[in-house]
Each structure stands twice: as structure tokens, then as C-alpha cells.
From Swiss-Prot:
This is Acyl carrier protein phosphodiesterase. It catalyses: holo-[ACP] + H2O = apo-[ACP] + (R)-4'-phosphopantetheine + H(+). Signal peptide: none annotated. InterPro entries: ACP_PD, ACP_phosphodiesterase_gpbac. Belongs to the AcpH family. Its EC number is 3.1.4.14. The keyword Protein transport does not apply. Converts holo-ACP to apo-ACP by hydrolytic cleavage of the phosphopantetheine prosthetic group from ACP. The gene is acpH. The keyword Methyltransferase does not apply. GO terms for biological process: fatty acid biosynthetic process.
Length: 193
């Protein structure tokens, strides 16, 4: 899961959106650094990551990637799941538009930015004004996201090439998304994540 799915599941679980978005920017035990609700959100994000990476449907998707890209497949898949969530948002969340959800998330997160790490503040300088969460629905934007990640982290250079595997196996990946994401939504609503 990437930013959109983590925020969506957090919202369904009534968990801290700030904590769920912040989690990748916090190392170690966050207790004592943030308030308990934010810590609980960070921990939920970590549980969702472990759960998602170990789902049989997600593990099976690694086979859709060429040998040279398989090492980065879990990262690519996290971004791809956000694409399918954004693309099918109205079907999954008919009562709230994606722009409306994005606005709600932004309003809950931005007031707390001064208390967060500089790298997280930097992310927030792009994610909201450039409408990343909404643009995840656009497949070319996913290619740009992967290329950007590859250029910022040389050891992840294979991310740029992994987009070809996504395009080649798009429908199979979409089918797998539908096999697990609605169930994760229900788990979030039931506070089981």
C-alpha cells in the first residue's frame, strides 16, 4: 500500500491519518515522540504493510515482474494498488469523492506538520498541491512516480523499468487488487488491522 490506500484504510478504521501517512518517515519505536493516537496510526501502517506483503494474492503478483525488476516488485505493487484504488474510488467509496476525501485528509494532516520530520514536511509540499492522490488514477502518473523514486534512490533504479511489467500485466494486477482490497476495507471497518 502507498499513501492513498494507507489513508483510506486509516479513515475506515477511524485511525490517525497523520500517523498512517507519517509512518514511513519514523524509525523505531515512536512511543514518546508522538501522541498516542498518532503512534497507533504509525503502528497500524506497519501492520498493514506486513499483512499486504504476505497476502497470497500480492505474493503471486511478483511473478508478473521480469527477473531484473522482481527485487523492487513489492515497492512497485504498493504504488499500483494506489492506482487501482484511485481509479475505482467511486465504486469503492460512492458516498465521498476522491477530491473530497483528499481535502479531508489534508485538513487533518497539515495543522500538525511543524511537529513532523523535515522529509515528511517536504512530501506534504508536493502531495497536496500537485494532487498526487487523485492523479494516481492516471497510469502515466504511476510511471512518473516510479521513475521519480528510481532517480532519487540509485539502489532502486529498477523501479523505472518495472513500469513496463505493470503495463504488460495490468489486467492481472487489477484482478488481484479486487481479490484482496475490499476484504482489507472490511477489516479496517471492523478495526482488525
Amino acid at each position: 500500500m502507498n499513501y492513498l490506500a494507507h489513508l483510506h484504510l486509516a479513515s475506515l478504521a477511524e485511525s490517525s491519518l497523520l500517523g498512517n501517512l507519517l509512518a514511513d518517515f519514523v524509525r523505531g519505536n515512536p512511543a514518546g515522540e508522538y501522541n498516542p493516537a498518532v503512534v497507533a496510526g504509525i503502528m497500524m501502517h506497519r501492520r498493514v504493510d506486513v499483512l499486504t506483503d504476505n497476502l497470497p494474492q500480492v505474493r503471486a503478483c511478483r511473478a508478473y515482474f521480469s527477473e531484473e525488476h522482481r527485487r523492487v516488485a513489492p515497492i512497485t505493487l504498493d504504488v499500483v494498488w494506489d492506482h487501482f484504488l484511485a481509479r475505482h474510488w467511486q465504486q469503492l467509496e460512492p458516498s465521498l469523492s476522491l477530491p473530497g476525501f483528499t481535502q479531508q485528509a489534508q485538513s487533518q494532516i497539515l495543522p500538525h506538520l511543524p511537529l513532523t520530520p523535515p522529509r515528511f514536511q517536504n512530501l506534504n509540499g508536493y502531495i497536496w498541491p500537485e494532487r498526487w492522490l487523485e492523479r494516481y488514477a492516471e497510469l502515466p502518473f504511476i510511471g512518473n512516480v516510479l521513475a521519480g523514486m528510481a532517480s532519487r534512490r540509485p539502489r532502486l533504479a529498477a523501479l523505472a523499468g518495472s513500469f513496463a511489467d505493470v503495463e504488460r500485466n495490468y489486467h492481472q494486477l487489477e484482478t488481484q487488487f479486487w481479490q484482496f482490497y475490499p476484504q482489507m476495507m472490511q477489516q479496517a471497518k471492523d478495526k482488525q488491522l
